[in-house]
């Protein structure tokens, strides 16, 4: 029996035959080209063909796994048309007199290395997207065939890495689990696994070191372990655990469509946190009442240049339409600190967590801010969009935001562009905002308490420093007292207050939050039903 550790992308237990997927590596040779113009045209033709193929993949994914998962292929089309990517390929052809295949391969290496080196895990996941579109181009240019994954029976798919174009073409009935050596929890494969509700592991080092194709495997998505050729004792133990898990899952699934209300009638809203359009499928599949946090900064982080108003509008409009009237709270740009974006040209800071970030960037770079607000106000005409501003610490910041909002609305009205009337709220994630929350509550429609940063700033602990893990205590009495104060101040002003940080998903505090009168919890989609069960089993009057 072999045992390998990985990082869980989704929980669950899978038992079955292993299917190893190893795609044929494309050998790209460097060739001297005399006619660079013809070679550049050959590349442009390949881009057109790739865009056409991606359109077909989008249609297939749309039918099989929904619009949110299909959106990855629209993103790939945008990446193919990206000016920086295209310019890099064309310049290499021109400057080095080389074939288009080689120029694409070089560009792929450069761009994927850039993404892979980023601190943010979501952005590291974009390295695979770059490689995927590049391999598609090289296949078209060289006249090759795309790899496909085929299996005669439901199997555990194990691979070095899996690209979106590979997973979408699989027969979903034949997939028990995904296990990859590389990848990230934000990769398309991980998101697809969460949508399908099957266990998945990424970063599973060494799993392909042995010849394992056709052997029996066990994937434990809860503990991040895969067993190859398990002994009878391990197999029997996991069969029992799998049966127990299936029973628990069925019980939780029965809670879909049920109200988030306690035994004594206390109501609370359960919303979901997401970072991209693809995750909307998870929001809907887990029966969330809305989106409590859409992290719009990822629209910026996955690019090499500023997204246009139209690009942002289309994304926010998709969110609004997919949620079909349910609230979708979109947080404005939250770049800075641990989320850096090179093309913003921000100065290097000694302490970025206390530096120019989030709303501070927006209020000093109003051109960027107004572009995003224009897109949000336009999209609000298509659904129930709320706008949320991060990192607030001062009353004057709210006043300035209101001025900019009014400027944007006036500009759109002058252009006769349709807009909605979105609710606007703020994140309470600085002690300053918590302490003046009684005054802030008079100027906004809702509060969302960001417990990650609130804990960091309250306890003076850098949450990015692993040496301080012992000191980072989100259960600290000071943090909980601050949350209670914010909730009370919100209610006095007649607005609602929710929690969107890690604490929201902490089941040991669910009853405490109910007792405090918290109106909304926003958590990862997979935590919705387990927390709903706790809520429905609780009598607040007895706490």
Outline where the language-model segments fall.
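Conserved, well-structured core domains of diverse proteins
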Residues: 1-145
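Acidic, glycine-rich flexible loop/linker segments
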Residues: 2-28, 142, 149-154, 158-285
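Conserved active-site and cofactor/substrate-binding residues in soluble primary-metabolism enzymes
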Residues: 38-41, 45, 71, 84, ...
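Generic secondary-structure signature for well-ordered alpha-helical cores
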Residues: 48, 52-66, 78-85, 91-98, ...
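Residues within well-formed alpha-helices
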Residues: 49, 133, 188-192, 282, ...
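Short, charged N-terminal helix-start/capping segments
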Residues: 80-128, 194-218, 294, 302-321, ...
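N-terminal-biased segments
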Residues: 113-151, 219-242, 440-471
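Conserved alpha/beta-domain cores
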Residues: 249-543
């Amino acid at each position: 029996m072999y045992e390998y550790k990985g990082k869980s992308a989704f929980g669950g237990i899978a038992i079955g035959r292993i299917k190893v997927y190893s795609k044929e590596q494309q050998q790209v040779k460097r060739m001297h080209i005399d006619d660079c113009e013809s070679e550049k045209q050959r590349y442009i033709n390949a881009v057109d063909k790739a865009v056409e193929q991606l359109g077909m993949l989008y249609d297939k994914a749309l039918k099989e796994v929904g619009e949110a998962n299909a959106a990855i292929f629209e993103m790939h089309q945008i990446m193919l048309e990206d000016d920086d990517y295209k310019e890099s390929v064309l310049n290499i052809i021109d400057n080095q007199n080389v074939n288009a295949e080689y120029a694409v391969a070089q560009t792929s290496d450069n761009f994927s290395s850039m993404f892979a080196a980023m601190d943010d895990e979501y952005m590291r996941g974009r390295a695979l997207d770059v490689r995927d579109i590049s391999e598609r181009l090289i296949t078209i240019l060289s006249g090759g065939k795309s790899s496909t994954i085929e299996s005669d029976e439901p199997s555990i798919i194990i691979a070095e890495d899996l690209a979106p174009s590979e997973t979408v073409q699989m027969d979903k009935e034949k997939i028990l689990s995904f296990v990859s050596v590389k990848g990230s929890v934000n990769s398309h494969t991980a998101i697809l696994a969460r949508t399908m509700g099957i266990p998945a592991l990424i970063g599973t080092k060494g799993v392909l070191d042995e010849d394992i194709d056709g052997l029996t495997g066990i994937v434990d998505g809860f503990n991040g372990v895969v067993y190859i050729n398990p002994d009878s004792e391990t197999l029997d133990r996991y069969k029992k655990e799998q049966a127990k898990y299936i029973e628990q899952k069925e019980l939780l699934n029965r809670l879909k469509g049920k109200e988030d209300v306690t035994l004594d009638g206390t109501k609370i809203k359960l919303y979901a946190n997401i970072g991209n359009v693809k995750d909307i499928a998870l929001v809907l599949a887990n029966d969330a009442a809305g989106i409590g946090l859409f992290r719009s900064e990822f629209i910026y982080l996955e690019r090499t240049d500023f997204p246009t108003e139209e690009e942002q509008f289309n994304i926010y409009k998709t969110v609004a339409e997919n949620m079909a009237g349910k609230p979708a709270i979109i947080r404005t740009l939250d770049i800075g600190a641990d989320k850096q974006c090179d093309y913003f040209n921000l100065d290097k800071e000694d302490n970025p967590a206390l530096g120019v970030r989030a709303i501070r960037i927006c209020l000093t770079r109003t051109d960027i801010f107004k572009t995003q607000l224009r897109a949000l106000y336009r999209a609000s005409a298509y659904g129930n969009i709320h706008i949320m501003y991060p990192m607030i610490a001062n009353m004057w910041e709210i006043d300035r935001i209101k001025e900019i909002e009014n400027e944007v609305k006036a500009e759109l009205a002058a252009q006769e562009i349709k807009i909605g009337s979105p609710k606007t709220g703020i994140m309470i994630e600085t002690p300053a905002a918590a302490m003046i929350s009684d005054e802030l509550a008079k100027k906004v429609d809702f509060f969302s308490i960001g417990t990650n940063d609130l804990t960091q700033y309250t306890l003076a602990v850098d949450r990015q420093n692993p040496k301080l893990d012992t000191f980072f205590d989100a259960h600290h009495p000071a943090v909980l007292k601050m949350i209670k104060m914010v909730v009370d101040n919100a209610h006095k002003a007649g607005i609602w207050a929710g929690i969107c940080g890690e604490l929201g998903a902490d089941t040991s505090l669910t009853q405490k939050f109910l007792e405090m009168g918290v109106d909304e919890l926003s958590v990862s989609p997979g935590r919705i039903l387990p927390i709903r069960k706790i809520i429905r089993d609780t009598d607040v009057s007895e706490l």
